[in-house]
Amino acid sequence: MANLPPRKVTSASKSKQDVSPLQILLQMGFRRQRALKALAATGNRSVQLASDWLLTHVSDSNIDADDPREYIFYASPTGPLLSQLLEFWDKSKSTCGWNGAHNFLPHITLVSFFKAPDDTSLNLAKAVRQVVENVGDPPKCTLKLEPYVSHNFMGLFISEEHAEYLKKIAVQYVKQVSSVSSINLEAHVKSLHITLAYHFEESSYEDLKTLVEEMQPVEHSSWELRLYSRDPRFANHQVYKVTQGYSPQASDELELVLGDYIYIEEKEFDISPDGWVHGTSWLTGLNGYLPAVYTRRTAETDAWTLLKAVSLGNNCSDCKSESGSNTDSEMAGTYPHEDAADLAYKKSEETYQEWDKYWSEVMNSRSDSILTITQGLPMNWELSKAAEEMKNNITNGTSKSRRWVFALRHGERVDLTYGPWVPHCFENDTYVRKDLNLPLKLAHRAGGKGGYVKDTPLTRLGWFQAQLVGEGMRMAGVSIKHVYASPALRCVETAQGFLDGLRADPSVKIKVEPGLFEFKNWHMPKGIDFMTPIELCKAGLNVDMTYKPYVEMDASAETMDEFFKRGEVAMQAAVNDTEKDGGNVIFIGHAITLDQMVGALHRLRDDMEDVQPYEIGRNLLKVPYCALGAMRGKPWDVVSPPCPPSINSSSGRFDWRILIK
């Protein structure tokens, strides 16, 4: 085949890949001011999100108003410290009622609210990354938080060394933004702290003080720099989340859509004679009267837009003092993991036998690729039908395309990787990690270690598998708006890993749906024991605490028909209820979930003649960890997923003693 000669002259000024989201929106017919407003309001995430925002705000009387958004720059804790702070939030709220701190996620303010034109939002987000690169990594010593308690304020103040680092970040961000624009902003450099409580009743002081004193902030914490924006019109409003849908019966009433946020002035509750209040929808920008009982107050930050999040270097592992060379006792095997020689022994031996078969196949057939052995015919994902259709929808300016609905099996699970693992990994009911692929830590649950026997977590590789799928979807340009997960811990963790890889906005939460759990009778011998939504949230999983499941599940036996019907009810209801809101849907469950999705959505067709009866087929054994199935509607058809699959080889446990000669 002849080599392709390089072109020396071209009339094209830029390729399609160089076309910006703004240019695509303009090509779709949207006015420049509206397009910029939509991109700023959705964090410049995608053309699809921006066009969806424009379509939902088509009747918003404020859509053409020249009212720039407000931005704020935070340092936000993540991981165990965030879980600890959220637990404090819950306790203080239930014990003492709402106070000012509950309006926001835990944070340290680096730059206070400032207004900026919509056409600067992308550069404001880029500046966050540039600031981290300019200032460098945070100090390597442990970050310490010092509690402070008074009658009108309670908080945690940052240790001096880390406070100086964050001040440099704040000052550098102000310089970075000011150097390229005339935006007026000011760094917050005095007494950096995390607010725990303020604007609380005097009668709550003692209870709040006790909660602060009981809390011992974890020292090994992770942090992110986050840039948020909000609609300035509602700066002094309270935010309420819709918990029950409502269709207007009068022209002055506001439609309530599950998951929407409503901006309501505090005075509305004082002047209302009948429990109806006036509010404005975050989703549509429309306003009207609504029954307050159909909403629940939530943090203002839930209705903000996250433009950029950049992780700061994890420093906790570098705080240990240096040690000398290995001692004889270390070489003899005194490490905690060395007493678990039998951990995964049987599984490892099975793996080594599979490896022997594989290498025999390679040598006999002279095959040089595992793809040849395990995959059959290769597929060109760049030219797949789904990828082409998706690409055309974007580049051709199609504002309305068929929705994606996905089904994803969970990632690699601990119990099927190691066999009986709990007896090896718990000492006096305390979890000890004895293999690098085991979880770093296990969250507290009511059932203790017995709960983990019945409800296994993911391995570290399982988390990574889930992140790979999310990353693949992100690189394919597909966003997810609605995430439903089986209540099994491995499925909820897979959902979180998927969202991490997708880099989804924190507002995209995991809805734990019992209807997606696999056949109950498979688990009857050892029982079913799920973690509660609160336990999952405390474990750092972004679970929707307000979600009301479509199916309530008990521990009684069920028939196979009842199992399939349970899944059908949940999947069909989720797809139908999210249709008006729009956005793609993913169900994260078990191996059978993929087949179950196909059957459930095919039953939404008008023509039911070709629909096959539910059954557990042989394909169940061909669904590996994090296998992804895809459908598009309407009509509902099985299509190629927008990203390729991933293949993993098994790995046995290594015994270092084989090196002793």
Curated annotation (Swiss-Prot):
Q: Where is the UBA domain?
A: 16-57
Q: How does activity depend on pH?
A: Optimum pH is 7.5 with ecdysone 22-phosphate (E22P) as substrate. Not active at pH below 5.0.
The EC code for this enzyme is: 3.1.3.-, 3.1.3.48
Q: Where is it made, tissue-wise?
A: Detected in non-diapause eggs, with highest expression between 2 and 5 days after oviposition. Not detected in other tissues tested.
PANTHER family (alphabetical): UBIQUITIN-ASSOCIATED AND SH3 DOMAIN-CONTAINING BA-RELATED
Subunit relationships:
Homodimer.
Question: Could you tell me what this protein is called?
Answer: Ecdysteroid-phosphate phosphatase
Organism equals Bombyx mori (Silk moth)
Gene, per the UniProt record = EPP
